[in-house]
Amino acid sequence: MTIAATALDYKVADISLAEWGRKEIDIAEKEMPGLMAIRNKYKGQKPLAGSRISGSLHMTIQTAVLIETLVELGADVRWASCNIFSTQDHAAAAIAVTGVPVFAWKGESLEEYWWCTRQILDFGNGLGPNLIVDDGGDATMMIILGYKVENNPSMFDKGGSNAEEKALFAQLKSIYDEDSTRWHKVAADMKGVSEETTTGVHRLYHMMEKGELLFPAINVNDSVTKSKFDNLYGCRESLADGIKRATDVMIAGKVAVVLGYGDVGKGCAHSMRSYGARVIVTEIDPICALQAAMEGFEVTTMDRAVKEGNIFVTTTGNKDVITLEHMKQMPDEAIVCNIGHFDNEIQVEPLNEYKGATKLNIKPQVDKYTFEDGHCIYMLAEGRLVNLGCATGHPSFVMSNSFTNQTLAQIELWKNDYEIGVYRLPKALDEEVARLHLEQIGVKLTTLSKEQADYIGVPVSGPYKPEHYRY
């Protein structure tokens, strides 16, 4: 990796890739009407003026459009990726040359990853962020865990239970040695965080229940125009993209096992079926299991499916969904991958420590493990996000939905003083995000008459559904 060494505040793989990145950003802007509409709406108004935003979210071409939207709205932005493999190096370079501090490159070590997260939380002169755009909750967690260890430095003695926690604690110890009240000062200045993904939202609610949340949060993930589009339709396209770029495998005729049938699992199951695979679903939730069965998918347990599958995809947000014992039983040449946020859905660490398997790297983010009996499996992206580790993530259009929500959430947090808690954007904004994307794909909306609106008890201009409505 070539580290750029100039007066600019960044660390990327290769700054010479900036021109390539800019060309792709220009293309992406045409596919992201929501973000471009927000730029036009607030042109000259700078609703985020004075804000300091730390972004911990995949540093892709689409994210570059989000970053430049936040900057155009007046924010001071620093950015890192939320996954060691998800950065598109040309996107990072293109943003870095504009003067936005970026700390991201594809293939970071865990130590480098947490160093990058540390950099985005430091705006100089003792200042931290007052807003965070988070994906998975790592930037939020660094502040909250740092706050806890400042109250109880004996936590450093434990040092973390796995490689990732050890890398995080090493950064926190370094910061503590420099300033033992750093995170108390940062937390006191925070206006809030907007969280992108299911896993990060679970973390927020868990911290709220334990009384550990230190600042307000907006749950962007559960906006309908995020979860029912990014999670579902985004995964429907990007999963197959990741698998095919990594393996060149023919999906038709294979047995694909999709673990989990939430919004992400639904997109993945339909993706694999659309390519001609026979799809088996595993689920813990009876409602989701019934949905899968009613869609025509076989629903069974992993213990039953493990000997049938040729492709295994975890989508659950839970840990140890595919165990070492499962991988020992898989058919020869099985492909194993994850599209949930963290790498602990698959027991990759126990697999790497297992003496009965040998590891051979085929190419970046593709590893072959051969077991004692001679059968092998292919692990993609080291069990991390396959669509970003082995491909380029979701298409621009669907990410425009998600990132429009993120931008609106940042404006909402900056302009208003929320109590500590986890909030959602109102239905009217959800509908507005959808409305901004209709013209791009040729949609013509029917308009209610006043009499029709009165008859069903809604305003002519919406919102059209109650808050509890399930789309």
From Swiss-Prot:
Subcellular location: Cytoplasm
GO BP annotations listed: L-homocysteine biosynthetic process; one-carbon metabolic process; S-adenosylmethionine cycle
Main location: cytoplasm
UniProt keywords, alphabetically: Cytoplasm, Hydrolase, NAD, One-carbon metabolism
Cofactor note: Binds 1 NAD(+) per subunit.
NCBIfam families in the cross-refs: ahcY, PRK05476.2-3
Name the record gives this protein: Adenosylhomocysteinase
Classification lineage: Bacteria, Pseudomonadati, Chlorobiota, Chlorobiia, Chlorobiales
